[in-house]
């Protein structure tokens, strides 16, 4: 019975504490990481799809197709480089907890891997004639 009373008192104290104004910042961080992760997943699917198109391009050598592929790769590359800059700046913040820091580092590492694959594919497209 004493345990239940102590637990109820603890819950009442926790509910009475003022809400931190930082919650918005942490929710925004969570939303940004989720959005970037979803976009990285879309870019990964795009890379898989476009790899087949690059194989066809190497066989045909169509210049219009080459220009289109380069434009699409450039847009994805710009998104990843922009997100890398954002995540690097956010990692310098001192108010990050362990989970947020891990999420930012994971998103940064995922972006780096995708950027490496994008650049390799871009080089393949540029070298095809």
Curated annotation (Swiss-Prot):
Which keywords annotate this record?
Answer: Allergen, Signal
Q: Determine if Plastid is one of this entry's keywords.
A: no
Gene3D superfamilies reported in the protein's UniProt record? 1.20.58.970
Superkingdom field? Eukaryota
What happens after mutating residue 53 to A?
Answer: Over 20% reduction in IgE-binding
InterPro entries on file: Mite_allergen_group-5/21, Mite_allergen_group-5/21_sf
What does UniProt note about where in the body, tissue by tissue, this protein is expressed?
Midgut and hindgut contents as well as fecal pellets (at protein level).
What residue stretch is flagged as signal peptide?
1-16
Q: Which GO terms describe its molecular function?
A: IgE binding; protein homodimerization activity
Q: What is the effect of changing residue 65 to A?
A: Over 20% reduction in IgE-binding
Subunit structure comment from the entry = May exist as homodimer and homotrimer.
| Family, per entry | Belongs to the mite group 5 allergen family.
What's the protein name? Mite allergen Blo t 21
């Amino acid at each position: 019975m004493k345990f239940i009373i102590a637990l109820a008192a603890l819950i009442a104290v926790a509910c009475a504490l003022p809400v931190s104004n930082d919650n918005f910042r942490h929710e925004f961080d969570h939303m940004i990481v989720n959005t970037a992760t979803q976009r990285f997943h879309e870019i990964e699917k795009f890379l898989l799809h476009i790899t087949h198109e690059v194989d066809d391009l190497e066989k045909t050598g169509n210049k219009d197709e080459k220009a289109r592929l380069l434009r699409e790769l450039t847009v994805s590359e710009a998104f990843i480089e922009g997100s890398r800059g954002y995540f690097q700046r956010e990692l310098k913040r001192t108010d990050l907890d362990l989970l947020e820091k891990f999420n930012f580092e994971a998103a940064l590492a995922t972006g780096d891997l995708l950027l490496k694959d994008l650049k390799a594919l871009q080089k393949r497209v540029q070298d095809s004639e």
